[in-house]
Amino acid sequence: MAEKTVRVQQIGSPIRREASQRETLIGLKLNKLHRIAELPDTPSVRGMIAKVHHLVRVLDGAA
């Protein structure tokens, strides 16, 4: 069975954000606006998305 994934798009700039938020975006494989990353749907990835929820958008209707 295929592993579940989540697609995340960066919609906010990391400029003037805390260093931990910038590092979280890098951990999510996002470094420029409007880039999309497909990541495994794990609790750790979901936690990272929650930490920078104001800078990213989850695509494909998954919440």
UniProtKB/Swiss-Prot annotation:
Oligomeric state and partners?
Part of the 50S ribosomal subunit.
Q: Which GO terms describe its cellular component?
A: cytosolic large ribosomal subunit
Q: Which SUPFAM superfamilies match?
A: Ribosomal protein L30p/L7e
Q: Which residues form a coiled coil?
A: none
Q: Which UniProt keywords apply?
A: Ribonucleoprotein, Ribosomal protein
PANTHER family the record matches: LARGE RIBOSOMAL SUBUNIT PROTEIN UL30M, MITOCHONDRIAL RIBOSOMAL PROTEIN L30
**What is this protein called in UniProt?**
Large ribosomal subunit protein uL30
| Organism from which the protein derives | Methylobacterium sp. (strain 4-46)
What does UniProt list as this organism's lineage? Answer: Bacteria, Pseudomonadati, Pseudomonadota, Alphaproteobacteria, Hyphomicrobiales
GO MF terms listed in the record are:
structural constituent of ribosome
